Swiss-Prot record:
Keywords: Acetylation, DNA-binding, Metal-binding, Nucleus, Repeat, Zinc, Zinc-finger. It comes from Arabidopsis thaliana (Mouse-ear cress). Its main location: nucleus. It is found in: Nucleus. InterPro entries: Plant_ZF_CCCH, Znf_CCCH, Znf_CCCH_sf. Residues 1-47, 360-453 are annotated as: Disordered. The gene is ZFN2. This is Zinc finger CCCH domain-containing protein 26. One of its GO terms (cellular component) is nucleus. PANTHER family: PROTEIN PHOSPHATASE RELATED, ZINC FINGER CCCH DOMAIN-CONTAINING PROTEIN 26. Transmembrane segments: none annotated.
Amino acid sequence: MSETQQQVQNSTGSIRSPDKIEDTFRRMKVNEDNMEQSSPYPDRPGERDCQFFLRTGQCGYGNSCRYNHPLTNLPQGIIYYRDQLPERVGQPDCETGACKYGPTCKYHHPKDRNGAGPVLFNVLGLPMRQGEKPCPYYMQTGLCRFGVACKFHHPHPHSQPSNGHSAYAMSSFPSVGFPYASGMTMVSLPPATYGAIPRPQVPQSQAYMPYMVAPSQGLLPPQGWATYMTASNPIYNMKTQLDSSSSASVAVTVTSHHHSFSERAECRFFMNTGTCKYGDDCKYSHPKERLLQSPPTLLNPIVLPARPGQPACGNFKAYGFCKFGANCKFDHSMLLNPYNNTGLAMSSLPTPYPYAPPVSTNLRISSPPSPSDMTTLSNGKPAAAEAQSLETEKQDDSPTEPEKSEVEDSLPPNGSDSTSLPNDKPDAETEKQDDDSAELDSSKVQDSSDKST
């Protein structure tokens, strides 16, 4: 018996029912060129059935799987086609339209939807499903956590209604019906959404940004132009308003708009500071009334937080700066206008480093006059005594030579500036002065005796 006949006999012997024969023909596919195509999974009638194949219709091991992969024992309604999505009759339809699970998806994929036109995506990469209801989370936040697997409709951001709730609020730019006298048309831009960067809150009276465009220039905002505005410096905005007030071509007024959710609780951080680091992602309410409570002139040169109800910051009041910056919980308000036409008085600003002249701590205590000074005054020499007193006062007033004054005060007051020699021998002038003083004393004693007699 040849080997071919033996293989045929073995194969026919392994077939136990007509269903196996039908199964074999079903697993054998013929293409347009009448070329036989082998089955993607092996048929092993004598082995146990692959449980994963029976449950999902595919096998991760492919031809190397050692178990049997019968098509007749598949659950009712499951029809597996290679390179196609599975059809599972009785299961809910897979509504993604771009199934990333492929043959392992447990939902039904009807033929009329398989191979249909591709799913359209918006500018954010989210699916647009015409006929389905809009995704509520996307309409509120501008994001979708399910991505391409979401079964709801995600329209383009510019087609959403601008209700202030979406982070990507965009709308068209209708022009006002009446033109200006100079032939220019006003275009009202929608309000900007709440920014995530903290900045000083300056309340504005207008809710929209007027922007005048000449028809001859043709400068119209493009469709879908984002209205999100970054954080701006209020001092720069005021300067821009002053500079643009003299121009008749363009008038720009920068405003800010804060969305609020009446059905949600108020943001405590926003109510205390006027800013919120989460921006549009914050789930709490940011009421507009909070912006109207702060006075419009609470500005300082380095844009520190102004907290009217809190005590004044000691560092800012004394030195003009605060090391804590925007995190300081005290008040840093200055009631002044940095762009006042009358000019800014420098005396109104706090001195960064106050300077006080140094005070001398060396105190001079003068000694009482000695009897020799009184004797000199009584002997008819007031000029020498007066000169000595003036010289002593000058020495007391001069702080640069304290040691010299102390040496002079330690000498005996004899009406002269001479000092004794190191060998303690008086010179001729000193001896002469001593003789004169002795004569004066003797004459004084004689005069007193004459008066007594």
